Amino acid sequence: MRVTSYLASAIALAALAFAPAAANARAARSAAMDDPTICAIFDAANSWDIETSDLAITKGSTKEVRDLGAMFSRDHKAVRAQGRDLVKKLNVTPTPPKDFALAADHEQAMKTLNSATGKAFDRAYLEHEVAYHKAVIDAINSTLLPATQNAELKELQVKVAPAFQAHMLAAQRLLDAMGK
């Protein structure tokens, strides 16, 4: 999976909030990135990483990759549950963006990962995880947090951000250990 695809997705996500001229940026951000949309993105980001990580549990060629997939899946299930509990508490209906480019990126990532085997799968999965977590971290910091209105939703994003960073670094360490 190419890193540029995820970085482009993060930029596209940020563009949803900052696309118009500077004078209208705040109004556009609030219209494009309201809390129900942020809740939907938060849920999707966790669900997608659960899906790719569950694939690593079954397809990983090394114990390290399978274990990393298991940890990521477990962690993202817990974070997704926290998000869903908050959505219920706040009585919010998550509303995905109209043009959710990240969904197409996830579908492509799954195609790539499903077609890879052995060490090629391990490398593709780890590269995906590094790029994916970087894109999510960038989107949280540059777009989602600034647009979030509800204090509890903002608090949840801040609370889980270090785990996203730790996941990115863990995948990078394992990728580095694989060598070229």
Give, region by region, the residue ranges found by the protein language model.
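Bacterial N-terminal signal peptides
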Residues: 8-18
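His/Met- and acidic-residue-enriched segments that coordinate or traffic transition-metal cofactors
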Residues: 3-6, 21-180
